[in-house]
Amino acid sequence: MKWSEISIHTTEEAVEAVSHILHEAGASGVAIEDPAELTKEREQQYGEIYALNPDEYPAEGVLIKAYFPQTDSLHETIAGVKSSIDVLPSYDIEIGTGNITVNEVNEEDWATAWKKYYHPVQISDTFTIVPTWEEYTPSSPDEKIIELDPGMAFGTGTHPTTTMCIRALEKTVQPGDNIIDVGTGSGVLSIAAAKLGASSVQAYDLDPVAVESAEMNVRLNKTDDIVSVGQNSLLEGIEGPVDLIVANLLAEIILLFPEDAARVVKSGGLFITSGIIAAKEKVISEALEKAGFTIEEVLRMEDWVAIIARNA
C-alpha cells in the first residue's frame, strides 16, 4: 500500500487544534516537528537523554506530519483539512502560513519510521509514559507506567499541557475520589487518575475515534474496572456531584462550560484545566472566578498553563 505524508506548516499555538483536525480526517499517525525542542532548557531531573537532529526540524514555526493511505478521495480529505484549518483564526488561534505539502511514502517506510518519534518519557515524579512497542523497566517501585499506542490517535500524552494536568492530578487526587475527564482523547488523564487511587473515573469525548482510543488504552493499562468511557459533549446531561473534573482542551472550549463544571463538581471540589496558551490565562481565570471558582494554583510549562481551581 502507498501512503501520503501530509505536512502542514503552522504555529505552536495551533498544534493541538491542527493535530485534532488531522485525526478527525482519518490520519493513521501524526508527528510534530517543533524547532523550539532544539533550544529549550530542560529540567533533566529524571536523567533523560535527548538526541535531536536539527536537520529534521523546520527553521521556524512547527511542522505537523500526518499519514493517510492513498485513496481516490485523498484530494477531498486534504481539501477538508485545509478548510478546517482556515477556520481556526476565527477562534483566535494563529495558524501561521498554514502551507500544506504532500509526499508519497512506501508502506514499509511508514510502518517503522514514524516510531522514531516516540520513546518512554518520565513526565513526573510518579509517571512514565511508554509506547506499547517499547520495553521499559521502572527505575523504582513507586514509578507508575502508562502504556499508550500513538498509532491509534492523539499522540503519546507528553505535550506540556498533558504533563501539567498529570502533575496537577498528582497534587490533588485522593484515594476514593470520583472524577470526570472532559475531552479525554487518548484517555491518559483518566488512566493516571485511576492509578493515583480514584475509585471511579468517567471519561467523555465527543469524537468517536477518541472514545475508541481511550477504551483501548484503558484496557491496555488494566484500569477498565475504574474508568468508564463514553461519548458526550462536554458536561451536557452529566449529573454530580464529583470530587474533581479535569479538562485538557483548547481555551475556547473551556470557556463554554465553567458554569456546568461548577454545577457538577461538589462544593470544595476541584476543576483542573489546561490546553491554555499563556496569553489566554487571564480570560480563563476570570471565567472560572465568575462561575464561582477560586484559583488555587497555576502551573506553567513553556508557553502553556494549567489552572487548579476550587469550587465555592
UniProtKB/Swiss-Prot annotation:
One of its GO terms (molecular function) is protein methyltransferase activity. GO terms for biological process: methylation. It catalyses: L-lysyl-[protein] + 3 S-adenosyl-L-methionine = N(6),N(6),N(6)-trimethyl-L-lysyl-[protein] + 3 S-adenosyl-L-homocysteine + 3 H(+). It comes from the Bacteria. Keywords: Cytoplasm, Methyltransferase, S-adenosyl-L-methionine, Transferase. InterPro entries: Ribosomal_L11_MeTrfase_PrmA, Ribosomal_PrmA_MeTrfase, SAM-dependent_MTases_sf. It is an enzyme of class 2 (transferase). Its main location: cytoplasm. GO terms for cellular component: cytoplasm. Coiled coil: none annotated. Its EC number is 2.1.1.-. It is found in: Cytoplasm. The keyword Cytoplasm applies. This is Ribosomal protein L11 methyltransferase. S-adenosyl-L-methionine binds at T162, G183, D205, N248. Belongs to the methyltransferase superfamily. PrmA family. Methylates ribosomal protein L11.
